[in-house]
From Swiss-Prot:
PSII binds multiple chlorophylls, carotenoids and specific lipids. One of the extrinsic, lumenal subunits of photosystem II (PSII). PSII is a light-driven water plastoquinone oxidoreductase, using light energy to abstract electrons from H(2)O, generating a proton gradient subsequently used for ATP formation. The extrinsic proteins stabilize the structure of photosystem II oxygen-evolving complex (OEC), the ion environment of oxygen evolution and protect the OEC against heat-induced inactivation. Requires cytochrome c-550 (PsbV) or OEC3 (PsbO) to bind to photosystem II (PSII). This is Photosystem II extrinsic protein U. The keyword Zinc-finger does not apply. InterPro entries: PSII_PsbU. Belongs to the PsbU family. It is found in: Cellular thylakoid membrane.
């Protein structure tokens, strides 16, 4: 393959890891298990966040229908841990956002 062909071949997941996706919870692409690290988010709020994606901004999670005031407070306290990037099919197809089959 020529250099120009090699440059055109990009692994979209590796490319995504070079963004804030690798540093924060990407509300549009991250697996539900990532929310475990923040108190009060897993499993209930994490499921709601994943179910209601995609989001245009981090603050959009505060508009999920049916949230209690306590849930909104927990989300507000964690907004700094979230980011939003474009939905990447390789990360969200099938049921991988709920169960990616990785177990400790």
């Amino acid at each position: 393959a020529t250099a120009s062909t090699e440059e055109e071949l990009v692994n979209v997941v590796d490319e995504k890891l070079g963004t804030a996706y690798g540093e924060k919870i990407d509300l549009n692409n991250t697996n539900i298990a990532a929310f475990i690290q923040y108190r009060g988010l897993y499993p209930t709020l994490a499921k709601l966040i994943v179910k209601n994606a995609p989001y245009e901004s981090v603050e959009d999670v505060l508009n999920i229908p049916g949230l209690t005031e306590r849930q909104k407070q927990i989300l507000r306290e964690n907004l700094e841990h979230f980011t939003v990037t474009e939905v990447e099919t390789a990360l969200v197809e099938g049921g991988d956002r709920y169960n990616n089959g990785l177990y400790k």
